[in-house]
Amino acid sequence: MTIAIDFVGTNVGSGTKTYNINFCNELESIDLKEDFIIYLSKNYFNQIKFLENKNSRIKYIVKSNIFSNIFFRLFWMQFILPFELKIMGVKKLYSPMNFCPILAKLFNIKIILALHSNLPWVFFHLMPGNIIRNLLTRKLMEFSISACKILIVDSYFAKEEISNILKIKKDKIKVVYLGIDKKFLSSECVKNFVETFNYSEKYIISVLSCVRYHNILNLLKAFKVLINEINFNIKLVLILQILDKKYYKVLNSYIVSNFEKDEVTII
């Protein structure tokens, strides 16, 4: 049986991009028993670490970087991809990024969908973007969940939560924990060290994107309570990817007003 995977995604630095590229690299390195067709953006394809002998079980279909744009990507996914899968005789599709081609269900293609966040149902007001776009996003995610045969979430808490919210049978939902980027476990990780940072100091580290739904402001408030209540020399280090500049200004303002110099460091 041929299995298709849709890795056509954003080129913005993110957990999604890291997940997709690492997934491809892992597939390339193992002895596969099934044939795979992998759809991916050109910018992803250029970052795959092919072995000397490319995995013969994998066929790559490289799409234009224009599909890094969410609107073009969704149009292609919903109205073109299902017919491509049908023509190639694909019977199983893995969609790893919250959405899947809904029409594929009409062609008896088994869809496995990965849902990375319950945010649209739990904290809708914290979603980035305007309300109309966010409502459409949530509805399309609901249609995708309805169309899939298996839904993958990243924790048992998320499974209980989404099952209760959308009234999904729990035997449809599987839990697969997200993994760590392998580069941080290898001897090559020294290349990622920040030379100006003192690693011998005591510190708490948090790595995340700077967006409101990560609620970094509450993290800062909690850290302030911690250092005020205990006499302990420790710092907070935030490694941020700044996706929301206005929120970043709010965080900086809070840090300046509430902490001594170097108590909180942003990298």
Q: Can you describe what each PLM-predicted range is?
A:
Residues 1-267:
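Carbohydrate transferase catalytic cores enriched for Leloir-type hexosyltransferases
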